[in-house]
C-alpha cells in the first residue's frame, strides 16, 4: 500500500476554514485552530438565530398592532378576536405594515372588529 501524505488535503481544509473566518478579529481570522472554533460557534449562532428571527419578527408585529389598536381604543387580543369574528383574514405581518404606513385603513379595520365584537 502506498504512503499517503496529507499535505494537499490538510491545506484545502485549512483554506476552507480560514476563508469562512475572513473578517473575524485578530487570531480568529489567521490561526487555523482558533478559526475552527470561531467558525463552529458562528454556525451555532446562525442556526439558533434563524429560528429566533421568526419569533422576534412576530413579537415586533404584535407590538406594533397592539400599539395601533390601543390608539383606537381596543386591546390587541380583542382586536384579533374581532377580526376573526368579522371573518377578516389578514396575517400579523400585513396588519403591522398597515398599522405603520396606512393609519386610515387600520382605523377602518378596528371599526369592523368593534362591530363584530358588539354582535
Swiss-Prot record:
GO CC terms: ribonucleoprotein complex; ribosome
Stretches assigned to coiled coil: none
GO biological process: ribosomal large subunit assembly; translation
Pfam families for this protein: Ribosomal_L20
Superkingdom classification of source: Bacteria
Record bears the keyword Ribosomal protein: yes
Record carries keyword RNA-binding: yes
Matches recorded under InterPro entries: Ribosomal_bL20, RIBOSOMAL_L20_CS, Ribosomal_protein_bL20_C
UniProt keywords, alphabetically: Ribonucleoprotein, Ribosomal protein, RNA-binding, rRNA-binding
Molecular function as annotated in GO: rRNA binding; structural constituent of ribosome
Function: Binds directly to 23S ribosomal RNA and is necessary for the in vitro assembly process of the 50S ribosomal subunit. It is not involved in the protein synthesizing functions of that subunit.
Family of this protein: Belongs to the bacterial ribosomal protein bL20 family.
PANTHER family the UniProt entry points to: 39S RIBOSOMAL PROTEIN L20 (PTHR10986)
Record-linked HAMAP family: Ribosomal_bL20
Name this polypeptide is given: Large ribosomal subunit protein bL20
Amino acid at each position: 500500500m502506498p504512503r499517503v501524505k496529507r499535505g494537499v488535503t490538510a491545506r484545502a481544509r485549512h483554506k476552507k476554514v480560514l476563508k469562512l473566518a475572513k473578517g473575524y478579529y485578530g487570531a480568529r481570522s489567521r490561526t487555523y485552530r482558533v478559526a475552527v472554533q470561531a467558525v463552529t460557534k458562528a454556525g451555532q449562532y446562525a442556526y439558533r438565530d434563524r429560528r429566533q428571527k421568526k419569533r422576534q419578527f412576530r413579537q415586533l408585529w404584535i407590538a406594533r398592532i397592539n400599539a395601533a389598536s390601543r390608539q383606537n381604543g381596543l386591546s390587541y387580543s380583542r382586536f384579533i378576536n374581532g377580526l376573526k369574528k368579522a371573518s377578516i383574514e389578514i396575517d400579523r405581518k400585513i396588519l403591522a405594515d398597515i398599522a405603520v404606513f396606512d393609519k386610515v385603513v387600520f382605523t377602518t379595520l378596528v371599526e369592523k372588529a368593534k362591530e363584530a365584537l358588539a354582535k
